Amino acid sequence: MDLTVFFLLIWPPYVANGSAVFASRLKWRHPVDFGRNFIDGRRIFGDGKTYEGVAIGIATGTVLGYFPNLVYHVIGVFDAFVLSASAVLGDLIGAFIKRRLCMPRGHPAFPLDQLDFLLTAFLVYSLFREIPVVYVLAAVVITPVIHRATNYVAYLLKLKKEPW
């Protein structure tokens, strides 16, 4: 396994997923679901999923995800965009599932919270490029640890209300 390739593949989804939290600092936020409920009477995604967060996640994931490739030439801008946009999509899918399970915003849901963004990114990206199975397995193993650590740092920085 080429560790450089591995880390450059997981970098855009990690950045996209982690940077969306900065939208919570904005004064005005617009929920992706427009405050509407699903057929079960519960919110589709909830107030935590906003257009601003989606835009910040995709933009930062694409730009910062591509940046190291100016040196290493592993993935292109399109790749960084697909990985970032699909990571944000995965996070929305995770929020949708949590709302269906009656979990409130911010409630921990292992392993859904830790892997929804990454597995969706890999699934969508695999429609365009081959991803070695060993990379997916390695990412599934290390991502919960990295996710927990970065969320705790975001909590300490008061970017998140919960440390998970």
Swiss-Prot record:
<feature type="transmembrane region" description="Helical">
    <location>
        <begin position="122"/>
        <end position="142"/>
    </location>
</feature>
<dbReference type="GO" id="GO:0043338">
    <property type="term" value="F:CDP-2,3-bis-(O-geranylgeranyl)-sn-glycerol synthase activity"/>
</dbReference>
<keyword id="KW-0444">Lipid biosynthesis</keyword>
<comment type="similarity">
    <text>Belongs to the CDP-archaeol synthase family.</text>
</comment>
<dbReference type="Pfam" id="PF01864">
    <property type="entry name" value="CarS-like"/>
</dbReference>
<keyword id="KW-1208">Phospholipid metabolism</keyword>
<keyword id="KW-0594">Phospholipid biosynthesis</keyword>
<dbReference type="InterPro" id="IPR002726">
    <property type="entry name" value="CarS_archaea"/>
</dbReference>
<feature type="transmembrane region" description="Helical">
    <location>
        <begin position="77"/>
        <end position="97"/>
    </location>
</feature>
<keyword id="KW-0472">Membrane</keyword>
<keyword id="KW-0808">Transferase</keyword>
<dbReference type="InterPro" id="IPR032690">
    <property type="entry name" value="CarS"/>
</dbReference>
<keyword id="KW-0460">Magnesium</keyword>
<keyword id="KW-1003">Cell membrane</keyword>
<dbReference type="GO" id="GO:0046474">
    <property type="term" value="P:glycerophospholipid biosynthetic process"/>
</dbReference>
<protein>
    <recommendedName>
        <fullName>CDP-archaeol synthase</fullName>
        <ecNumber>2.7.7.67</ecNumber>
    </recommendedName>
</protein>
<dbReference type="GO" id="GO:0005886">
    <property type="term" value="C:plasma membrane"/>
</dbReference>
<comment type="pathway">
    <text>Membrane lipid metabolism; glycerophospholipid metabolism.</text>
</comment>
<feature type="transmembrane region" description="Helical">
    <location>
        <begin position="3"/>
        <end position="23"/>
    </location>
</feature>
<keyword id="KW-0443">Lipid metabolism</keyword>
<keyword id="KW-0812">Transmembrane</keyword>
<comment type="function">
    <text>Catalyzes the formation of CDP-2,3-bis-(O-geranylgeranyl)-sn-glycerol (CDP-archaeol) from 2,3-bis-(O-geranylgeranyl)-sn-glycerol 1-phosphate (DGGGP) and CTP. This reaction is the third ether-bond-formation step in the biosynthesis of archaeal membrane lipids.</text>
</comment>
<keyword id="KW-1133">Transmembrane helix</keyword>
<feature type="transmembrane region" description="Helical">
    <location>
        <begin position="55"/>
        <end position="75"/>
    </location>
</feature>
